[in-house]
Amino acid sequence: MRVAMISMHTSPLQQPGVGDSGGMNVYILSTGTELARQGVEVDIFTRATRPSQGEVVQVAPNLRVINIVAGPYEGLAKEELSTQLAAFAGGVLEFTRRGGIEYDLIHSHYWLSGQVGWLMRDLWRIPLVHTAHTLAAVKNSYRADEDTPESEARRICEQQLVDNADVLAVNTQEELADLVHHYDADPDRISVVSPGADIALYTPGNDRATERSRRELGVPLHAKVVAFVGRLQPFKGPQVLIHAVAELLERDPQRNLRVLICGGPSGPSATPETYRNLAVELGVDKRIRFLDPRPPEELVAVYRAADIIAVPSYNESFGLVAMEAQATGTPVVAARVGGLPVAVAEGETGLLVDGHDPALWADTLATLLDDDETRIRMGQDAVEHARNFSWAATATQLSSLYSEATTAECDGGIPRRADGARWD
């Protein structure tokens, strides 16, 4: 089987935590790699962002990333990339025609890619599987006060994809429910495919490994450490953690607490300086260390150095950071939103917080920070929990889904009107 994956707005080869690169990039590269190992030929189409990239990158046997020139290499924000959909689609068509390449199925990721996938589906007359990763209606329902709302244009495009894709692949039952509730999706066309973690890379370390990680990161060996890993934007909630830390230290100024915030800027709503300034304003800047985004092999040290990983997001379709942390043996305190209650086994591998009140977050963090026995037990259970979520298992689910889609009587290649209805 040969599959065309589309990830227009961000390359799976880009460093997670930088700009628009995050969990989706990890998902695409990880599933592509595992599908390739299972014998599926995968081409991932993405927009070129620098001339030195080269058109084709052979990532592994059966796995290529195709860089399509569409608009300037730099200077376009994600919100402006819809202006380049035609150029990108034209580049995909030109590449496949030049190489005489035919695909059995398209798998698009995010709404921008979905619009291109929808067109390719009708031109190539093959099935379209679409994964949204995030949804405008959901983000607007849960967004932080500081966040910029998602546009109505995006929501309309997502509705078109919900109505026209042959299969909608989602991470959890919660995401399925969101599609039905906000977009009136047909449940029979939705398949739940659980994401995973690189459980060969993210492994628990012993005391010596933890000590080494803390030395590398400049963290006191005997401090209690809470870490945040993710893009620095209000929707991910770093401001919630900073306020919670201020609350904890106001209650007990002598608490031996350190915080690591690992991530880069993303989106128009905030910059790293926003959060550094907030820490200074609240008087906790001496307790917080900001780290640049790190590749996965270096991110392991951040997870191992922490006693707790905090995931205060306003919504997550799954929560890869939570799963990676648990694979390394670090318990998680996460917001009770989206797919996080699936990623975190409440009371067993971590704790869930209702809402984003810093005082409540401080209470929950203190519960684990002050109970070594429970925290250590949760870390041990977290490793076992994470073993149920591997990228190999995700790829196996996707491969089965692809096979079903290519053999079923899907709408692949049947044009629809602009309102989503099929032509008679």
Curated annotation (Swiss-Prot):
Sequence positions that bind Mg(2+): 303-304, 306, 330
Q: Name the reaction it catalyses.
A: 1D-myo-inositol 3-phosphate + UDP-N-acetyl-alpha-D-glucosamine = 1D-myo-inositol 2-acetamido-2-deoxy-alpha-D-glucopyranoside 3-phosphate + UDP + H(+)
Q: Which cysteines are joined by disulfide bonds?
A: none
| CDD domains associated with the record | GT4_sucrose_synthase (cd03800)
List its EC numbers.
2.4.1.250
Any one Gene Ontology MF annotation carried by this entry is: D-inositol-3-phosphate glycosyltransferase activity
Q: Which InterPro entries match?
A: Glyco_trans_1 (IPR001296), Glyco_trans_4-like_N (IPR028098), Mycothiol_biosynthesis_MshA (IPR017814)
Keywords attached to this Swiss-Prot or TrEMBL record, sorted alphabetically, are: Glycosyltransferase, Magnesium, Metal-binding, Transferase
Q: Does the keyword Magnesium apply?
A: yes
What is the similarity comment for this entry?
Answer: Belongs to the glycosyltransferase group 1 family. MshA subfamily.
Subunit note: Homodimer.
Q: What does this protein do?
A: Catalyzes the transfer of a N-acetyl-glucosamine moiety to 1D-myo-inositol 3-phosphate to produce 1D-myo-inositol 2-acetamido-2-deoxy-glucopyranoside 3-phosphate in the mycothiol biosynthesis pathway.
Q: What is this protein called?
A: D-inositol 3-phosphate glycosyltransferase
What species was this sequence derived from? Answer: Corynebacterium efficiens (strain DSM 44549 / YS-314 / AJ 12310 / JCM 11189 / NBRC 100395)
Gene name of the record: mshA
